[in-house]
Amino acid sequence: MENKDRLLLIDGSSVAFRAFFALYNQIDRFKAPNGLHTNAIFAFHTMLSSLMERIEPTHVLIAFDAGKTTFRTEMFADYKGGRSKTPDEFREQLPFIKEMIEKLGIRHYELANYEADDIIGTLDKMAEAPNVNFDVTIVTGDKDMIQLVDGNTRVEISKKGVAEFEEFTPDYLLEKMGLTPAQFIDLKALMGDSSDNYPGVTKVGEKTGLKLLQEFGSLENLYENVDSLKASKMKENLIADKEMAFLSQQLATINTKAPIEIGLDDTLLKGKKVDELSQFYDEMGFAQFKSKLLAEAGGEVTDEKVVDEIDFEIVTDGSISEKVNADDFFYLETLGENYHREQIVAFAWGNAEKIYVSKNIDLLTKMKFPENTYDFKKNRVLLSHLDIELPLVKFDAMLAKYLISTTEDNKISTIARLFNSGHLATDEEIFGKGTKIALPDDAVLFEHLARKIKVLALAKEKMMAELLENEQEHLLSDMELPLAEVLAKMEITGIAVSQNTLEEIGAENEEKLASLTREIYDLAGEEFNINSPKQLGVILFEKLQLPVGKKTKTGYSTAVDVLEDLAALSPVVAKILEYRQINKVQSTYVKGLIPQIADDGKIHTRYVQDLTQTGRLSSVDPNLQNIPVRLEEGRKIRKAFVPSKDSLLLSSDYSQIELRVLAHISGDEHLIDAFKHGADIHTSTAMRVFGIEKAEDVTANDRRNAKAVNFGVVYGISDFGLARNLGITRKDAKNYIETYFERYPGIKTYMENIVREARDKGFVETMSHRRRKIPDINARNFNVRGFAERTAINSPIQGSAADILKIAMINLDKALSARDFKSKLLLQVHDEIILDVPLEELDEIKVLVKQTMEEAIELAVPLKVDENTGKTWYEAK
C-alpha cells in the first residue's frame, strides 16, 4: 500500500465555538484558579486529543477567522450579518485556545480578509499538487467544507458538541444527497444559508434545490433552461432572484487560492513543549491533562522536529580548490532579499555525501565555482561586490523548479518537499522575518546551509528527469540560464536617475494637488479629508445625494470603478479621480523612487525571473514596469531616467507582438495576410468587423473600437466586458465578437482547440514548451471555469511573446559582446528593451538592435520593432 502523509486541517473558529457550547451547561464548573472560564479550552483540548489519536496525522493546521470583514462582506455587506453577539465568556477563552495549540506543537493560522474555510481550502489544494502525497482530513462544524471532498480529502462535520462527527466522502455525499461536491455549492446558492445570512432564491429550500439540481445538473444549466419550467411561483422566484443566486454561489464557494504565507512544510507536527504545556495546565487547572503529559514525556522534554542528522565540514582558511568539484552545488547566504544592498554572510558547497560551510568570505576569491547553484543571478550580483565575475553555471535549481511548475513558490524548502529530498526548515524559521530578521548562532546557520546543499544535490536528478520528460531542458539551458546572466549584467549596470528632476516633478505635483484640493472643497461646499473613504462617502452620497453604487460594512464604497460611473453626474467626482491619480504618482513614484537611488546615482532594480505564470519578467525594488503611462504626470516620471555621459537612451519596442503571435499559432489566414502586407491591424479589423469598405473611411473611433476588440479577444473578453470598455450595449458588443470570429475563423478554432487541450492535459504550452497548469479548467462553477478558459487561451500567446523577448535579449547581449560595443542593455519593460548607447555607436546599434529583435524567431508573420531615442526615457518613448 502507498505510504501517504496525513494532513489534518481543523476549522478552529467553528470547532472552538461548538466546544464552548458543548460544555455551556457546566460553564460554572470549568474555571481556572484565576477565575477564567475554561469550558471551551477544555472541550477543544479533548476534541483535539481524540482526533490526534484517531487520525495520527503527520501534519496539522488549525485555521481561524481573522475578523468579521472579509472579501465576502465586500461582495455582500450583510454576509453573516444576522448573527448574535459572541458571548464574552467565549471571546475571553479564544486567545488561550491558540496559546494551548502552540504549546502542543501545532501550527495555527489566520489571514486578514479571508475566512478559515479559505485557508483550509488553499492548503487542501496544495496537498493535491503533483509530487505531493497526502491524505487530508478536514474537521469543521461548517457544511460549506463539503465542497472540498474528493478522492484524497474527507470532511468530518461535528454533530453533537465535539465528540460525534459525520464523515463526508464523494460516495457518501452522492448516497446521502445525490450530489457531487461541486453541486453542493449550487445547492447552497439556491437555498441560501441562514447562518451566513445570504438568501439564495426565495422559498427554495433543500428539498426543492436538490430536485432542481438532479434535473438540471448545475446552477448555470438551470438558468440556461429556466424557460422550460412550467409557470409557477418558484419559476418567478428563480427569475427574479437570479442575480442573488449567482452571488450566493460566489459567497458559498471556498477560495482555494488565498494568499497565505505558509505552506505544507509549516504544518509538520512538532513535539509538545512539555515544560510550557505543563505550566499552562497548572494555570488552567487541568490536572488530568498534566498527569497524562508527564507520563507520556517520561522525563524527556523536546520541542524540535525529528530530522536526520547531517555531517558537514566548517572551513575557516587555507586552500579550498581541492575541496571543490565541478558537479557540486554552491549557495550564497544573505540576510535580506535585496542583494544589491546585502552582503554575503556565509556560503556552502558540496554534494549529497560531502558538504562544506564557511563564513570566511575571502575564500570566495580563491574558489573555482561548481556548475550547479540556486539563483545564479543573485549569486552573480553578490560576487560582483567582491570583484568576482561568476561564470554561467549549467544548472540552477530555482529556475528548474519554476519551469517544472509555477503553482508553488520556488524556495529550497518547497523543492525539498516536492522532490522528496529531505527536510529543510524555512528561512523564516531560521532567520525570522520583517524587522526581526537576524543571524542565528553559527551552529544553526551552518546546519541550515548544509541542509540546503543536500536538498539541492538530491533533487537535481529528479528535476532534470522531469524537465526532459516535459521537453523543457532547452528552456533551462538555452533560455532561462543565459537570460539570468543578461539580467545580472543589467542589474549591475543600473540606470542613471536624476534626483533633481524627480524633486522638480514632485513640486509640480504638490502644486496640482493643492489646486485640486481647493477645487474639490469648493465643489463639495466644505473641507474634508479627501484621502478618507469614509468622509468622501458622506460627501458624495449624503451631502451631494449621488446614487450609491456599492456599500461595504464600514460605509460607502468609493472605489475607482464606482467613481468612474459617477463622473458624468458631478464635476467633483472627476476632480477626485484626478487627485487620486496624481497623489498615487507622487507617493509611489516620486517619493518612492528617490530612496532607491544608490550612491552611484543609479537605480538597480531586481528582475524577478521565477514569479509570473506566463514567463513574463517582473521587477521589484523598485517596480519599473508599473510606472503609469496613460497619465501625463506618470509619463513625466520617465524624464528622470537618463543615459550616461555622451550617450542616448534607445527604446526598441515590439509592435503588437501578442497579436502577431496569435496570427502564428492560430494560423488564421486573414490575420496573417494583414500582417504580411504591413496593414494597420486595427484598421483592418475595423473594416472586416464593422463592414467598412475603404481604409480611408475608418475613423479614429472605429480604429479605437477595433483595437479594443483585437486585444479583448486575446484576453478572452466577454460581451459584458467589451460593452463596458466601449460604452456600448451588450447586444452590440456580442455582435462585434461574433462578427470578429466570423471574419477570423482561425482564431475561433484556436480558442476552441486550446481549451479542449487544457481540459485533456490540465495545462497549456507556449511555442517553446513553457507550461502553465490550468487546475480549474473543469470546475463546475461557471465563473471559475470561465476564468480558467480565458487563462488557457491567453497563456500560450502571452507566454510565447515573453519567450520571444527573452530570446531577443540573449541574442542582443551576445551581439554586443562579440563586437565589443560600449552600448549596454539597461531595462526591459513589457515589450520594450532600453539601451544606453554612446553617440558614436548610435547608427550601428539601431540597425543591430532592430535586426536582432525582428529575427529572434521565425513566425508566419514578420516581427516589427519601433525604435526611438532621447536624452531621457520620456523622450525615447
Swiss-Prot record:
Its EC number is 2.7.7.7. Keywords: DNA damage, DNA repair, DNA replication, DNA-binding, DNA-directed DNA polymerase, Exonuclease, Hydrolase, Nuclease, Nucleotidyltransferase, Transferase. Residues 180-270 form the 5'-3' exonuclease domain. PROSITE patterns: DNA_POLYMERASE_A. InterPro entries: 3'-5'_exonuclease_dom, 5-3_exonucl_a-hlix_arch_N, 5-3_exonuclease, 5-3_exonuclease_C_sf, DNA-dir_DNA_pol_A_CS, DNA-dir_DNA_pol_A_palm_dom, DNA/RNA_pol_sf, DNA_polI_exonuclease. One of its GO terms (biological process) is double-strand break repair. SMART domains: 35EXOc (SM00474), 53EXOc (SM00475), HhH2 (SM00279), POLAc (SM00482). One of its GO terms (molecular function) is 5'-3' exonuclease activity. Residues 308-468 form the 3'-5' exonuclease domain. It holds the Pfam family DNA_pol_A. In addition to polymerase activity, this DNA polymerase exhibits 3'-5' and 5'-3' exonuclease activity. PANTHER family: DNA POLYMERASE I, DNA POLYMERASE NU. Belongs to the DNA polymerase type-A family. Single-chain monomer with multiple functions. NCBIfam families: pola, PRK05755.1. This is DNA polymerase I. It comes from Lactococcus lactis subsp. lactis (strain IL1403) (Streptococcus lactis).
